[in-house]
């Protein structure tokens, strides 16, 4: 029994050793061999050397293609025989200038004599000399020292005075020109034109016979603020103009004839657009004269709608000319007055 166990142990050890040897041999066989270790490497190298012809090299060490042997040089080492490369910018700058095809041998200068200009002046020679003397004698004032700043109104007054003095000096130095037309005839023509214009204006529109008035007043215990009134006026296409009040024109841009206007209900009845933020009033007045330009009924309808819109925007009340609440009876009365003056 002991002999059988010994035999089995020996056979198992032999089998294990055989398996290990076979594994190492398989791994060794699967690894690729390098070209140096291969016996055929030297053979192929020798064949290549035999087939390739020897390269012909000249005295300087360059072959037929101009390729020389590889040289290893240190960094920073310079060759004294090499020529420095030319910058492309220098190549662009150095260009041969084209020679002119035609060479001018002689040059002729043409001198143009000034042409005397005729004297179209209306003044006599004596007056011209006097005017030149006045211009030469006139000198510009020189301001020395520090000048304190002036206010806008004061500066405007000073500029106006200076302009008047200059005009007066020119009028005294420049003599009277010779008249080329009949002054009396010209004055007669201008007077006749003015009379004709006045007649056409009078014929186009008669004197006002009636005035339609609407009041927009604040509620009891309140006032209308100017900061709120100004944007409302501009929204309703009113434009600040004559008599320092706002007007509604035929054109919404503020051009053409005036249809109706807005004034302050309190005396003096004017507005100051520059100080509307500090302005307050009890109410404003819409008024339209009869007869008016265009359709009177249409103009009154626009004025009534503008008054109602303004009252809605600023929380106010619309009253008639007698400061009574606006109603249907008052509306019929205004329409009757419009038809009577149409």
UniProtKB/Swiss-Prot annotation:
Residue ranges annotated as Cytoplasmic topological domain: 28-342
InterPro entries: Cell_div_ZipA, ZipA_FtsZ-bd_C, ZipA_FtsZ-bd_C_sf
Alphabetized SMART domains for the sequence: ZipA_C
Region (Disordered) location: 33-57
GO biological process terms on file: division septum assembly; FtsZ-dependent cytokinesis
Key words, A-Z: Cell cycle, Cell division, Cell inner membrane, Cell membrane, Membrane, Transmembrane, Transmembrane helix
Sequence ranges on the Periplasmic membrane side: 1-6
Membrane topology: Single-pass type I membrane protein
GO CC terms, sorted: cell division site; plasma membrane
Function: Essential cell division protein that stabilizes the FtsZ protofilaments by cross-linking them and that serves as a cytoplasmic membrane anchor for the Z ring. Also required for the recruitment to the septal ring of downstream cell division proteins.
Subunit structure: Interacts with FtsZ via their C-terminal domains.
HAMAP family: ZipA
Protein name: Cell division protein ZipA
Lineage of the species this protein comes from: Bacteria, Pseudomonadati, Pseudomonadota, Gammaproteobacteria, Alteromonadales
């Amino acid at each position: 029994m002991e002999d059988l166990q010994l035999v089995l142990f020996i056979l198992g050890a032999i089998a294990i050793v055989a398996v290990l040897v076979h594994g190492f041999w398989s791994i060794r066989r699967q690894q690729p061999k390098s070209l140096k270790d291969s016996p055929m490497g030297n053979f192929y190298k020798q064949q290549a050397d035999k087939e390739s012809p020897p390269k012909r090299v000249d005295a300087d060490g360059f072959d037929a293609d101009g390729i020389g042997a590889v040289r290893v040089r240190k960094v920073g080492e310079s060759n004294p025989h090499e020529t420095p490369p030319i910058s492309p910018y220098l190549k662009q700058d150095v260009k041969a200038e084209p020679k002119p095809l035609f060479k001018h041998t002689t040059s002729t200068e043409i001198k143009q004599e000034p042409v005397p200009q005729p004297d179209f002046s209306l003044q006599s020679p004596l007056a011209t000399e006097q005017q030149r003397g006045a211009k030469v004698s006139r000198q510009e004032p020189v301001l020395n020292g520090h000048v304190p700043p002036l206010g806008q109104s004061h500066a405007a007054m000073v500029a106006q005075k200076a302009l008047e003095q200059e005009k007066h000096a020119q009028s005294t130095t420049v003599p009277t020109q010779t008249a080329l037309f009949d002054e009396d005839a010209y004055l007669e023509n201008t007077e006749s034109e003015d009379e004709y214009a006045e007649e056409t204006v009078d014929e186009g529109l008669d004197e006002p016979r009636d005035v339609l008035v609407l009041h927009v007043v604040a509620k009891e215990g309140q006032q209308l603020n100017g900061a709120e009134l100004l944007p409302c006026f501009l929204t309703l296409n009113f434009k600040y103009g004559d008599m320092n009040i706002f007007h509604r024109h035929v054109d919404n841009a503020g051009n053409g004839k005036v249809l109706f206007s807005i004034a302050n209900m309190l005396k003096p009845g004017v507005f100051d657009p520059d100080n509307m933020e500090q302005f307050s009033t009890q109410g404003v007045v819409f008024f339209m004269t009869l007869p008016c330009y265009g359709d009177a009924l249409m103009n009154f309808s626009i004025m009534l709608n503008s008054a109602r819109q303004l009252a809605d925007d600023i929380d106010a009340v619309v009253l008639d000319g007698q400061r009574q609440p606006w109603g249907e009876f008052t509306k019929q009365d205004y329409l009757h007055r419009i038809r009577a003056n149409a």
